[in-house]
């Protein structure tokens, strides 16, 4: 069971935690209504017919939400991501933390994991803070 949970978490980070970025390729919509919406595809956002509420109304909204450095990180974000970053110390090890300014996970050499915003790995940080893995 634990193996399944770990695989699910890692698989979720590959496409990003924001599932709204992914095109569900819905065949049938309620009332047959389809709208032009934008979804992440590779390094950009592209328009595609979708059911109301799927994807984003504009390419700009999609890019802000689906790429590191921009977007709505309110979905599935751990509160520790917004704590103070770890400080440096002589006996410290490599510590990963979330930088809210750049909306990325960064590594601090010789960091003291005394901060709430300290993660054991970049993947752990990305999963907790909703950062897409590139």
From Swiss-Prot:
Residues 17-69, 83-129 form the BPTI/Kunitz inhibitor domain. One of its GO terms (cellular component) is transport vesicle. Residues 70-82 are annotated as: Linker. It holds the Pfam family Kunitz_BPTI. CDD domains: Kunitz_ornithodorin_C-like. Keywords: Blood coagulation cascade inhibiting toxin, Cytoplasmic vesicle, Disulfide bond, Hemostasis impairing toxin, Platelet aggregation inhibiting toxin, Repeat, Secreted, Signal, Toxin. InterPro entries: Kunitz_BPTI, Kunitz_BPTI_sf. One of its GO terms (biological process) is envenomation resulting in negative regulation of voltage-gated potassium channel activity in another organism. GO terms for molecular function: serine-type endopeptidase inhibitor activity; toxin activity. Residues 1-16 form the signal peptide. It is found in: Cytoplasmic vesicle, Secretory vesicle; Secreted. Expressed in salivary glands. Disulfide bonds join 21-66, 29-51, 45-62, 81-129, 89-112, 105-125. It comes from the Eukaryota. The keyword Disulfide bond applies. Tick salivary thrombin inhibitor that plays an important part in the anti-hemostatic strategy of ticks. Inhibits thrombin-induced platelet aggregation, but has no effect on ADP- or collagen-induced aggregation. Is a competitive, slow-, tight-binding inhibitor of thrombin (Ki=4.89 pM). It requires thrombin fibrinogen-binding exosite for optimal inhibition, as its affinity for thrombin lacking the exosite is much lower (Ki=22.3 nM). This is Thrombin inhibitor savignin. It comes from Ornithodoros kalahariensis.
């Amino acid at each position: 069971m634990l193996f399944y949970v770990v695989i699910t978490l890692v698989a979720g980070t590959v496409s990003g935690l924001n599932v709204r970025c992914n095109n569900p390729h819905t065949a049938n919509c309620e009332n047959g209504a389809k709208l032009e919406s934008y979804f992440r595809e590779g390094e950009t956002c592209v328009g595609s017919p979708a059911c109301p509420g799927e994807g984003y109304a504009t390419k700009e909204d999609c890019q802000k939400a689906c790429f590191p450095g921009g977007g709505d990180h309110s979905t599935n974000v751990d509160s520790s991501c917004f704590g103070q970053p770890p400080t440096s110390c002589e006996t410290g090890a490599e510590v990963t933390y979330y930088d809210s300014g750049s909306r990325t996970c960064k590594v601090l050499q010789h960091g003291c994991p005394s901060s709430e915003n300290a993660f054991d790995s970049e993947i752990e940080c990305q999963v907790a803070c909703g950062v897409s893995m590139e």
